[in-house]
Amino acid sequence: CTSTSTTIHTSLRLFRTFGGRRGSLRGHDREVWRSPGSTATFPSMADIYTIAAFYEFATLSNLEAYQRSLRALCERAQLRGTILLAPEGVNGTVAGPSAGIEELLVHLRALPGCQRLSPKFSTATAPPFHRMKVRIKHEIVTIGDAEIDPTSRVGEYVTPEDWNALIDDPETLVIDTRNDYEVRVGTFKGAINPNIETFRDFPAWVQQHLDPAEHRRVAMFCTGGIRCEKATSLLLREGFESVHHLQGGILNYLQRVPETESTWSGECFVFDQRVALDHDLQPGTHSLCFGCQEPLSPQDRAHPDYEASVCCPRCASSTTPEMRAQRRERARQVALAAQRGERHVGR
């Protein structure tokens, strides 16, 4: 536990605190589990929230038992966020008091095959999550192909310090494995955008656009490392031989590579209420459209079709007068709740 505490506090010194942002999490904010009789309270707005993002591919069974123990621990430790359990491992992002995060990580590392689980830490001055969800799924990151097994074979990890040299090589094909709306917010210079709506679309894109005989060296990346790691397992199965992925993902790169040496362009979309982070891992300039949940740049918000809490240039044409009226009323209720120092129940 002492080593975990040291890791958290060392990591937190690398981050400046940031405020939360309002917005749903694009299909990731469905209710999964909530303690029905909970009396625990999340830390006050004056507190600093520790955020831990983590994943580990490992062969797990007895998922229901792990779910119960994690539910109890997170309730007791006043944690909120999402933890996914599947036969292939664990994946999650959780926020709360640093002591509770320490306890959770000790518990997670006790799971079979998860001893090397290495979280990425950040902090916040406002809660990035409003619920705690512990969910059992078929996959911890959904690609839709049961034959892909990252627990048995994945590509070669590339450290952030070695990443630039790899992707600057003209013989390397660099692929962004994230969804199209994430790529739009920011990506590495020269990276290919598969233009996929979800990670489930990635295998079909590989079949249509990649060839092991032509693309002899492939380097892939994603936000925190989980999608590109699973993608390497797919490519190795398809006969690609030299397959690489960015260790710890974009967030690890932004933390460890100085901006003066960086080949990253734009901001990094994240699946919480911060929406996007800049190179210093501070909240960026993007927000989410309440209507379509697409990320919005300052230019999007300056467009005549944009109306705060109602619609944006991408969804304005499909937003009916009735929908506009409902969203305006909701925005009014949210503002009134904020004036009373309360959180609107719909947020």
Predicted regions and their residues:
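Leucine-biased recognition of intrinsically disordered, low-complexity hydrophobic segments
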Residues: 12-14, 25
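Rhodanese-like catalytic fold shared by cysteine-dependent sulfurtransferases
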Residues: 46-154, 179-218, 226-347
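Internal catalytic-core helix/loop-beta-alpha segment
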Residues: 153-169
